[in-house]
């Protein structure tokens, strides 16, 4: 029998009891159990995603969330914890290029400022002022998407200005509404994101305290508020922010000096061989001398000299003789050198005639010594 016929045949006084019986029907019980089962499954999957996040398997975490349909505005509205996990994972993810195209598209839709999904997500996140750290992650993700997705400079500049305006407005709302429950660490982080990530990174400008003071000029209540909030006993949020800017400036200067020093060192090493004697013999003598010095030092420290194929003295003497020969052939055996040598020889012979007598006895002495020299050489050869 149809349900309408049953309702028509029931007496009026029994309608309430019939409705009561209908509520206790197995169909409704099964429906409740089905809903509970779905919720249990969703909780299990969410816990699995959380475990992947804790293990720093961020790519797998995001892929799992996409697979089960968690990256959806309806899901975000009904379960903010899923949204918090998604934003945190996207914030940690180094680059979206490692993700699949479908997942990339879902992420870009959530964090691209003018998309309907981003507008709805922004309403959910920025509406809960108590979650400032999650809000900061959301802004960092928007910055990351601007860098990742926009190659046109003009479009990137427009999106940067739009994000700058959104962040400035939110800072004003936050310090106005959260006077007594301000998250000082989160607020400092938010201001530094605005300065270093938006002003410096996206606008491609050098850090300067003027960036902070320009924001304070736009938001007159900002500086007095930050001066009155302390991170520690003697350091206010404003002091910490200005110190961070100064540290960033000093680091940039140090990097710049390091690069310049590296260039100078490369130039020095490139020209260094030209500063020394270009002759190969000079280099050989220096190498031999260095080898001898190192050998002596090792001999003093260990008491034993390293074994070598050639004697160090022989190498040093041979190298020295090569240099001397090279110098002699370059300096003496030329026209001027020969002329000067000849004149000196004539003067010596003329002044010291006694030398001639010595030269007369040289052949006889040589014939006398020659057999002994030959015998000595044969003896050395036989050893």
From Swiss-Prot:
Q: How is it modified after translation?
A: Phosphorylated.
Q: Which GO terms describe its molecular function?
A: protein-membrane adaptor activity
Which membrane topology term applies here? Single-pass membrane protein
> Topological domains (Lumenal): residue ranges?
350-383
This protein's record includes keyword Transmembrane helix = yes
Name any Gene Ontology BP term. Answer: protein import into peroxisome matrix, receptor recycling
UniProt subunit comment: Interacts with PEX6. Interacts with PEX19; targets PEX15 to the peroxisome.
Main function: Peroxisomal docking factor that anchors PEX1 and PEX6 to peroxisome membranes. PEX26 is therefore required for the formation of the PEX1-PEX6 AAA ATPase complex, a complex that mediates the extraction of the PEX5 receptor from peroxisomal membrane.
What protein name does the entry list? Peroxisomal membrane protein PEX15
């Amino acid at each position: 029998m149809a349900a309408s016929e049953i309702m028509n045949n029931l007496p009026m006084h029994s309608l309430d009891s019939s409705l009561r019986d209908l509520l206790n029907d197995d169909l409704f019980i099964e429906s409740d159990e089905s809903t509970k089962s779905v919720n249990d499954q969703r909780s299990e999957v969410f816990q699995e995603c959380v475990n992947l996040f804790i293990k720093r398997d961020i790519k797998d975490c995001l892929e799992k969330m996409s697979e089960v349909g968690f990256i959806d505005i309806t899901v975000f509205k009904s379960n903010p914890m899923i949204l918090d996990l998604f934003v945190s994972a996207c914030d940690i993810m180094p680059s979206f290029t490692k993700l699949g195209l479908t997942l990339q598209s879902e992420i870009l839709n959530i964090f691209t400022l003018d998309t309907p999904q981003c507008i709805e997500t922004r309403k959910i996140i920025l509406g809960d002022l108590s979650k400032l750290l999650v809000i900061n992650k959301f802004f960092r993700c928007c910055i990351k998407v601007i860098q990742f997705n926009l190659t046109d400079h003009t479009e990137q500049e427009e999106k940067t200005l739009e994000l700058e305006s959104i962040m400035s407005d939110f800072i004003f709302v936050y310090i106005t509404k959260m006077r007594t429950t301000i998250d000082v660490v989160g607020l400092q982080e938010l201001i530094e994101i605005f300065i270093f990530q938006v002003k410096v990174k996206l606008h491609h400008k050098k850090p300067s305290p003027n960036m902070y003071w320009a924001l304070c000029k736009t938001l007159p209540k900002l500086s007095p508020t930050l001066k009155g909030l302390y991170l520690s006993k003697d350091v206010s949020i404003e002091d910490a922010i200005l110190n961070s800017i100064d540290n960033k400036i000093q680091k940039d200067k140090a990097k710049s000096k390091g690069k310049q020093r590296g260039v100078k060192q490369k130039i020095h090493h490139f020209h260094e061989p030209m500063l020394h004697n270009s002759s190969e013999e000079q280099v050989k003598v220096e190498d031999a001398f260095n080898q001898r010095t190192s050998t002596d030092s090792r001999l003093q420290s260990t008491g034993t000299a390293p074994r070598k194929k050639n004697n160090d003295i022989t190498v040093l003497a041979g190298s020295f003789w090569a240099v001397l020969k090279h110098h002699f052939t370059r300096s003496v055996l030329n026209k001027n050198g020969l002329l000067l040598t000849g004149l000196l020889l004539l003067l010596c012979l003329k002044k010291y005639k006694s030398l001639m007598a010595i030269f007369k006895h040289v052949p006889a002495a040589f014939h006398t010594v020659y057999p002994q020299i030959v015998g000595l050489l044969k003896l050395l050869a036989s050893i």
